[in-house]
């Protein structure tokens, strides 16, 4: 009576326990194959030694092991004959032998990654009685609840999570903490196992913030340097220039990527971007951001509006009159709005009658104001300027400031590459 293991159980040991109420003259126990994996050596029979024939509790722990087969199903028969020759039997039905630890593997997330969700992916090779995903904080923000233990339930203990998905009862992790993750479990025969450790996974559900402090709203912008501040390292990012007014632009939305050095957390007073190759002078844009961090959180929306782009004025600008062709040459300093000026007559590849001076642009007003101070003060000019396209300007000029674009002869200058 009182035998172990129990019927219909999975076991990881060959130990059989019993309780006998009288002395026996002989006894044996037998493992009879009933199903599962084939066992060509079955049945397995072992006679009890003399010290196991006494009344009371006994077990076979001191007897040699049998050559049982993993995942084979057996019926265990205990048989004993008392001193009067009476024979009794006890059957333990449907016992599955399994002394192998389950094979567990965590497949997702990946080590040294960042995630903004609680999806996991894992594999197991047999049904579990207990399964846990354990998150142990190893860096980042503190987590007073570490280690965080996720108990698997239902079908989660029986089948693989081949694709990343959220469990029935997701864990409560701390935003900004970095965890090592491990899968632990016990199968139905109580064999225990642990998986590989997924290291340094950052849980991050905070969206990055990118602040644009240059250019500002309702301003003009020239050059290629912008001023930005980034709250955290970015996986990728781009500045989005969208036409909202002014002259036409062949492309209404420009995505200008941020160079790698500007994807790091920090403040950048002069972040160089390839703007001048994309934007067009005289066009009014709004400036926003399209960026994401390493957990794929998209950046918080930001928009700077009513920015008028002014191209670099460096180079030669030609006005073709009825008889002659006039050329203006601008050599701006670092400000871009003032510098050296030269005008002359274009004769093929040469310039004659050169006159030199300095120039200053004021782009804060419309039309723009161009003041030229020549080495010969009698040649000083004040001009009103409008962009017609990226490479063409309309000019009205005089010794005094013209009242409007209609106050004098309108001349059209065209920029030509060297």
Language-model segments: residues:
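N-terminal helix-cap/turn-to-beta initiation motif at the start of protein domains
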Residues: 67, 172, 307-318, 329-331
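Tryptophan-anchored aromatic micro-motifs
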Residues: 310-326, 359, 415
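N-terminal glycine/threonine-rich, aromatic-flanked beta-hairpin/loop signature
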Residues: 321-370
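Edge beta-strand at a domain terminus
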Residues: 353-363, 396-418
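Flexible, low-complexity linkers/stalks enriched in Thr/Pro that connect modular domains
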Residues: 1, 82, 91-105, 196-208, ...
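Conserved structural position at the C-terminal beta-strand
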Residues: 78-80, 183-185, 289-291
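Structural beta-strand segments of beta-rich domains
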Residues: 12-16, 116-120, 222-226
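Signal that preferentially marks extracellular ectodomain short beta-strand elements
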Residues: 46-73, 83-84, 154-178, 188-189, ...
């Amino acid at each position: 009576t009182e035998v172990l293991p129990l019927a219909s159980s999975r076991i990881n040991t060959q130990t059989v326990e019993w309780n006998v109420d009288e002395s026996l003259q002989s006894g044996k126990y037998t493992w009879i194959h009933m199903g599962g994996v084939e066992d060509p050596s079955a049945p397995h029979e072992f006679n009890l030694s003399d010290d196991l024939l006494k009344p009371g509790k006994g077990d076979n722990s001191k007897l040699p092991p049998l050559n049982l087969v993993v995942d084979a199903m057996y019926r265990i028969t205990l048989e004993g004959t008392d001193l009067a020759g009476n024979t009794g039997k006890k059957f333990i039905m449907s016992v599955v032998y399994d002394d192998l630890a389950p094979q567990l593997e965590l497949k997702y997330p990946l080590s040294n990654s960042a995630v903004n969700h609680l999806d996991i992916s894992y594999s197991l090779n047999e049904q579990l009685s207990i399964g846990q995903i354990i998150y142990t904080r190893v860096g980042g923000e503190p987590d007073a609840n570490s280690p965080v233990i996720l108990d698997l339930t239902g079908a989660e203990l029986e089948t693989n999570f081949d694709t990343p998905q959220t469990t029935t009862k997701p864990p409560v992790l701390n935003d900004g903490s970095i965890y090592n993750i491990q899968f632990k479990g016990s199968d139905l025969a109580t064999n225990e196992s642990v998986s590989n450790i997924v290291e340094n996974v950052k849980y991050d559900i905070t969206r990055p913030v990118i602040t644009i402090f240059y250019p500002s709203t309702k301003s003009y912008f020239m050059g290629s340097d912008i001023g930005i501040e980034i709250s955290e390292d970015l996986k990728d990012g781009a500045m989005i220039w969208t036409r909202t007014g002014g002259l036409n632009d062949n492309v209404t939305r420009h995505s200008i990527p941020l160079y790698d050095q500007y994807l790091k957390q920090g403040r950048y007073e002069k972040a160089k971007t390839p703007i001048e190759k994309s934007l067009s002078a005289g066009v009014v844009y709004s400036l926003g951001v399209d960026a994401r961090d390493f957990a794929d959180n998209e950046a918080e929306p930001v928009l700077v509006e009513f920015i008028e782009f002014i191209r670099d004025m460096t180079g030669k600008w030609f006005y073709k009159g009825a008889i002659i062709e006039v050329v203006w040459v601008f050599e701006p300093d670092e400000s871009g709005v003032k510098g050296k000026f030269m005008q002359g007559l274009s004769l093929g590849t040469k310039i004659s009658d050169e006159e030199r001076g300095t120039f200053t642009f004021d782009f804060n007003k419309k039309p723009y104001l161009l003041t030229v101070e020549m080495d010969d003060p009698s040649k000083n000019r004040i001009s009103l300027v409008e962009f017609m396209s990226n490479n063409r300007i309309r000019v009205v000029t005089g010794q005094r400031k013209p009242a409007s674009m209609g106050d004098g002869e309108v001349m059209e200058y065209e920029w030509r590459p060297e």
